[in-house]
A protein has these predicted regions:
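N-proximal helix/coil linker or "cap" segments that precede and/or mark the start of modular domains
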Residues: 15-35
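Short pre-active-site segment immediately N-terminal to redox-active cysteine/selenocysteine motifs
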Residues: 54-56, 61-64, 132
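Conserved helix-turn-beta segment immediately C-terminal to the redox Cys motif
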Residues: 54-55, 70-94, 108
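Thiol-based oxidoreductase modules, predominantly thioredoxin-like and allied folds used
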Residues: 87-100, 112-122
Length: 140
């Protein structure tokens, strides 16, 4: 788990210099996770309450964001194969302002094996931050 934390921290710090926008996080270290529900045609529904007791990596991205593409490629290559079968780990990759159809089309090209969740109106991502992607949160 230490490697996950180090990987996430390194990714966050390295990508801050490439971010499209800047804004303070709404969620701060020590805060409880905001209540939310994500719906995906391909991956079903997940509620924040379902995540209790798990280590959760939340990644917020957009299909047009260059740094997001680099980060997700690394997640696919390094992180997902190692932790995808760990019942105490959950990864939520959330497409900010994207629909299910847009994410399905995007994933045809990218061939990611981790689940993608749409957030077309920023109803979930807006509870974490209003700007700046990619953005990742490690929650335990």
């Amino acid at each position: 788990m230490r490697k996950v934390i180090l990987f996430c921290a390194a990714t966050l710090f390295s990508l801050l210099s490439f971010a499209q926008e800047s804004d303070a996080d709404i969620v701060k270290v020590g805060d409880n996770i905001p209540a939310f529900t994500l719906h995906s045609t391909a991956n079903g529904t997940i509620n924040s309450a379902d995540l209790k007791g798990k280590v959760v990596l939340i990644n917020i991205f957009a299909t047009w964001c260059g740094p997001c593409q680099s980060e997700l490629a690394e997640v696919q290559k390094i992180l997902w194969p190692k932790y995808k079968n760990n019942k105490d780990f959950c990864m939520l990759v959330i497409g900010r302002e994207h629909t299910d159809d847009q994410l399905a089309e995007y994933n045809k090209r990218k061939r990611f094996t981790f689940p993608l969740y749409p957030d077309p109106k920023r109803e979930v991502t807006g509870k974490f931050a209003t700007k700046m992607i990619p953005r990742s949160y490690l929650i335990n």
